[in-house]
Regions:
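Surface-exposed extracellular loop regions of Gram-negative outer-membrane beta-barrel proteins
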Residues: 87, 92, 242-245, 328-335, ...
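Structural signature of Gram-negative outer-membrane beta-barrels, strongest in the C-terminal barrel
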Residues: 219, 227-229, 344-470, 536, ...
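Extracytoplasmic beta-strand/coil segments of soluble accessory domains associated
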Residues: 49-90, 114
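Outer membrane beta-barrel strand-and-loop segments of large Gram-negative receptors
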Residues: 304-310, 321, 346, 352-354, ...
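Short acidic/polar hinge/loop motifs at secondary-structure boundaries
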Residues: 88-120
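Gram-negative outer-membrane beta-barrel transporters
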Residues: 152, 360-367, 466-468, 489-585, ...
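N-terminal periplasmic accessory domains that precede
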Residues: 48-51, 67-70, 81-84, 103-109, ...
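Periplasmic-side early beta-strands and strand-to-turn transitions of outer-membrane beta-barrels
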Residues: 144-262, 471
Length: 648
């Protein structure tokens, strides 16, 4: 995604994710939400996941180190995560969704973020596979003309002594090496979460990451940047703390659980060119992403060459570009041996070209059409279209709507016949066999939104959406043994297992819903923002036809109240409600619903000096208990947060 050189303002939010280039958020051909730098500062968000909890249509699944982002009823695997428009994807080193939330751990510290842009709904016409549910784009601060920086540190202390405390520090620094020619910026972040003393609770987690960007500006029209990024995560679960010490019985033998320690490493290199000319804007980047899971001997590399170029002529803004990608995976976990040979390395190449034109037919109406052609060496070609209109009948109303397609290619292991991935969570010995006949998953999304703003102190919006999902890849059990783990009654090529599965395209599903937003500047110093989301999912085929698809609450309500009590003191309050979820499809069977819950948070921000920010907050004020037994996950009870930020 190209980066805007314009500063964020309250009057005109500028976004780049919807079309690839800077435009006003209200005119973007997508349902898009912006979390501005002011929001990040005044609401004292702890990390990116915390900020996304207030976005309509977004569900933060799991908790703590296992948080994942789902949009509009689609699972977290269908949400594309970007940092400055560049893809972040390490799912290849955590098969079967082990240790959810890894991608969130790669995000930069809050102090380095300029804004966050969220597209709700498919964006495959522009971004390709993985953007089937939506896109989260983290826009970081740019290289400064004069030396500046900030450091932010905070601590979260649990009211319950059984819960683990969290400590984190983030640093951002930027400035010129050669004035107006060469600049540098960098970030560093350290976060440590202590392990809970609750069975099924939060694991101990330590995250360390940093990046360095050299920015060369030979003239006003061109910028060349080279970036190196390194991130490390470690997770530790201890028997008797978060792991149940009770032994399991298999064939009359006791098996005792053991401690779990998992490390994840990510390294990224990128070279980017941006050009800004009178009627032509361009961005091209080459990126290499390396993801490592040494505890499971998995190593993944993703190499991407991407270009976007926008031409403006007459009433048109034409965006054309392309992408080439190579995926490589080294994994010693293959359980299948064919002819005495075990496949441990997988590779796949793909490329795409796309074009998108915004045609302003009349001053009040713009029509955007997109077309993307993808070529995959395993799946052949795929065409992804989009047609979207934006109508502004007057200066208070905007009506937007359109139809867009989405698609997602199968993961490397899932699409390889000679691959058998171990599974079973350590209790059962199971295997998932790859299937080269898998087809990409596809969706058709229709949405219509009405947005009103009196350009003074009131704004409201209402969006209707419907997504038809087909060729969903589902794990189907081809052999199921008895209920006693370790009996190994299923056979495959001379090997014995408790169960054997294969992934197949079997299901169709529908996701539909309503998103409503309301913003009211009650007084010059008092702001109220609220949003409500209704989501309904239904499987249209397969063994569970008529049943819900995902573990999503049907009703979500978020509201925040901000009061600037004094020029140096502001207070905030937040309420997040999640209704009872429906029963949902887990990997191979329907799972029970989980109860509703409501969290209330509140805090203060005090600025004794322009360069100093002091924050304090109470999260889950009423100490609502969300535990593994009733909810399938553990969320923190009441906790207290204090923070300090210094900007120079």
């Amino acid at each position: 995604t190209a980066q805007s050189t314009e500063a964020d303002t309250e009057l005109e939010e500028i976004v780049v994710t919807a079309s690839g280039f800077a435009q006003k958020a209200k005119e973007a051909a997508a349902s898009i939400t912006v979390i501005s730098s002011k929001d990040l500062e005044t609401k004292a968000y702890r990390d990116v996941t915390d900020a996304l909890k207030d976005v309509p249509g977004v569900v933060v699944t799991g908790g703590g180190s296992s948080s994942d982002i789902s949009i509009r009823g689609m699972g977290s695997a269908y949400t594309m995560m970007l940092i400055d428009g560049k893809r972040v994807n390490s799912r290849g080193v955590r098969p079967n969704s082990d240790n959810a939330g890894i991608e969130q751990g790669w995000m930069p510290p809050i102090t380095a973020i300029q804004r966050i842009e969220v597209i709700r709904g498919p964006a495959s016409a522009l971004y390709g596979s993985d953007a089937m549910g939506g896109v989260v784009n983290i826009i970081t601060k740019k290289t400064a003309d004069a030396w500046m920086g900030s450091i932010k540190t905070d601590a979260t202390i649990q009211a319950n002594s059984e819960g683990g405390n969290t400590y984190q520090t983030g640093v951002f620094v930027s400035g010129p090496l050669i004035q107006d020619v060469l600049g540098v910026r960098g970030t560093a972040n350290y976060s440590h979460r202590e392990e809970d003393k609750i069975i099924g609770g939060y694991k101990e987690q330590t995250m360390r990451n940093g990046n360095l960007v050299l920015s060369l500006t030979p003239n006003d029209q061109n910028t060349i940047e080279f970036e190196v990024l390194r991130s490390l995560q470690s997770r530790n679960a201890t028997v008797g703390k978060t792991i149940d010490p009770t032994p399991t019985v298999s064939k009359g033998k006791l098996t005792y659980p053991t401690d779990s320690l998992t490390d994840y490493d990510r390294t990224q290199y990128s070279l980017t060119h941006q050009g800004y000319f009178e009627n032509f804007t361009t961005q091209t980047y080459l990126q290499r992403e390396e993801n490592d899971n040494p505890s499971r001997s998995m190593f993944e590399t993703n190499t991407i060459l991407n270009t976007q170029n926008q031409f403006k002529f007459g009433n048109h803004a034409l965006n054309v570009g392309g992408r080439w990608q190579r995926e490589q995976l080294d994994d010693a976990g293959n359980q299948l041996s064919i002819g005495g040979t075990t496949l441990n390395q997988l590779e796949r190449d793909s490329w795409a070209i796309f074009a998108e034109d915004e045609w302003r037919i009349v001053p009040q109406f713009a029509l955007t059409g997109s077309l993307r052609y993808d070529q995959d060496e395993n799946y052949g070609s795929n065409v992804t279209p989009k047609l979207y209109g934006v109508w502004q009948p007057n200066d208070q109303w905007i009506v937007k709507g359109g139809v867009s397609k989405g698609y997602k290619t199968p993961a490397l292991r899932a699409a390889t016949d000679g691959w058998g991935q171990t599974t079973g969570g350590g209790k059962s010995k199971g295997m998932i066999i790859g299937n080269s006949n898998l087809k990409p998953e596809k969706s058709t999304n229709v949405e219509l939104s009405f947005n009103w703003d009196n350009n003074d102190n009131l704004a409201a919006g209402l969006t209707f959406f419907n997504t038809d999902f087909k060729d969903k890849i589902t794990e189907v059990r081809s052999c199921v043994g008895d209920d006693v783990p370790g009996t190994l009654t299923c056979q495959w090529k001379g090997e014995s297992f408790d169960f054997i599965s294969q992934r197949e395209n079997v299901d169709k599903a529908q996701m539909r819903g309503v998103e409503a937003t309301f913003d009211w500047k009650i007084t010059p110093t008092l702001d109220l923002a609220a949003n409500y989301t209704y989501t309904d999912t239904e499987q249209k085929s397969g063994a569970f036809k008529g049943q819900p698809l995902n573990q999503m609450p049907k009703h979500m309500f978020n509201t925040t109240l901000n009061w600037q009590a004094h020029e140096k003191l502001s207070t905030w309050g937040r309420l997040n409600y999640r209704s009872r979820t429906s029963d949902y499809l887990s990997r191979t069977a329907m799972a029970d619903s989980t109860p509703s819950y409501t969290f209330v948070d509140m805090g203060v921000v005090y600025k004794p000096k322009t360069e100093v920010n002091l924050t304090a907050g109470v999260y889950n004020v009423f100490d609502k208990q969300v535990d593994n037994a009733d909810y399938g996950t553990t969320l923190d009870g009441r906790r207290f947060n204090v923070g300090f930020q210094y900007t120079f």
